[in-house]
Swiss-Prot record:
Listed GO CC annotations: extracellular region
Disulfide bonds: 41-63, 45-65, 56-76
Full protein name: Evasin P1170
Localization (cell): Secreted
Glycosylation sites: 44
Function: Salivary chemokine-binding protein which binds to host chemokines CXCL1 and CXCL8.
Keywords carried by this UniProt record: Disulfide bond, Glycoprotein, Secreted, Signal
Primary location group: secreted
An example molecular function term from Gene Ontology annotations: C-X-C chemokine binding
Length: 102
């Protein structure tokens, strides 16, 4: 009896977790106020014998080395996060002022 109750509770917990993950995932897909972009800088980076990583150049020094744990090589990537929710929506008069004048 106790085993059946425990199994039932486990199944209920997994179902609740699955529903939660589904709703969080679909909510994140509809979030258009945030943008996260990644660009390859055209170079790779390697770990030297002293443990330091070779520097990444490009994008005015904003490229960083990203690598997996235990690997001695990685990619130089430029990442940028933009939160558009911090900017107000333009109003009609602001849009009219941006039109080219004859």
């Amino acid at each position: 009896m106790e085993l059946k109750t425990f199994a039932f509770l486990q199944i209920a917990a997994f179902i609740a977790l699955g529903v939660q993950i589904f709703f969080v995932g679909t909510d994140a897909l509809g979030d258009e106020d945030q943008l996260f972009s990644v660009e390859y800088c055209g170079t790779n980076c390697t770990q030297q014998d002293d443990g330091k990583w070779t520097p990444c150049s490009g994008k005015n020094g904003k490229c960083k080395c990203y690598h997996e744990d235990g690997k001695r090589y990685g990619l130089c990537l430029y990442t940028e996060y933009t939160d558009f929710s911090q900017y107000p929506n333009p109003e009609g008069s602001e849009i009219e002022n941006t039109r080219p004048r004859p």
